[in-house]
UniProtKB/Swiss-Prot annotation:
It holds the Pfam family MraZ. The gene is mraZ. This is Transcriptional regulator MraZ. GO terms for biological process: negative regulation of DNA-templated transcription initiation. It is found in: Cytoplasm, Nucleoid. The lineage of its organism: Bacteria, Pseudomonadati, Pseudomonadota, Alphaproteobacteria, Hyphomicrobiales. One of its GO terms (molecular function) is DNA-binding transcription factor activity. Forms oligomers. Belongs to the MraZ family. CDD domains: MraZ_C, MraZ_N. It comes from Azorhizobium caulinodans (strain ATCC 43989 / DSM 5975 / JCM 20966 / LMG 6465 / NBRC 14845 / NCIMB 13405 / ORS 571). Keywords: Cytoplasm, DNA-binding, Repeat, Transcription, Transcription regulation. Residues 7-54, 83-126 form the SpoVT-AbrB domain.
């Protein structure tokens, strides 16, 4: 299965378009879509994005709850209700809507971060801060598991 991996920082052009990194476009094409499904992250001041596989995962998550239950309605509103279907143009670009840009505080640059089954779109400075915090949490986790090897920059040690 193809995955979204690596990190890329790209500029928005004068028309507000941003190029999706070529490796990510390849994954989306193999997923059988020319649309980018994008919604405000539920966990971070960033955007979650992906193709039909991401939408299938969202559907599976929502389907765990009984129809018309409060939890199902809230998840559906938070995920389906805020997902934008962005058309990918022939040059591999999308236009982020104002509501998406506002949620993630995006102005003229974005950082794409692969998360395997999906990717996240960040304002670059916010991502740098998030990554520093995430690395510290991983170091603490490794120490708590007794796997600190002195090589704290590597997950595998």
């Amino acid at each position: 299965m193809d995955r979204f991996v690596s990190t890329y920082t790209m500029r928005l052009d004068a028309k507000g378009r941003v190029s999706i990194p070529a490796p990510y476009r390849t994954v989306l094409a193999k997923d059988g879509t020319d649309l980018l499904h994008c919604h405000p992250s539920l966990a971070e001041p960033a955007l979650d994005a992906g193709g039909t596989s991401l939408m299938a995962e969202i559907e599976a998550l929502i389907a765990r709850y009984p129809p018309y239950s409060e939890a199902r309605e809230e998840l559906a509103a938070a995920l389906y209700g805020t997902t934008e279907m962005l058309r990918i143009d022939p040059e591999g670009r999308v236009v982020l809507t104002e509501s998406l840009k506002t949620h993630a505080a995006i102005a003229d640059q974005v950082t794409f971060v692969g998360l395997g089954h999906k990717f996240r779109i960040w304002e670059p400075e916010r991502f740098r801060a998030h990554l520093a915090e995430a690395r510290e949490k991983v170091r603490q986790l490794r120490r708590s598991l007794g796997s600190g090897s002195g090589n704290e920059g590597s997950i595998s040690g």
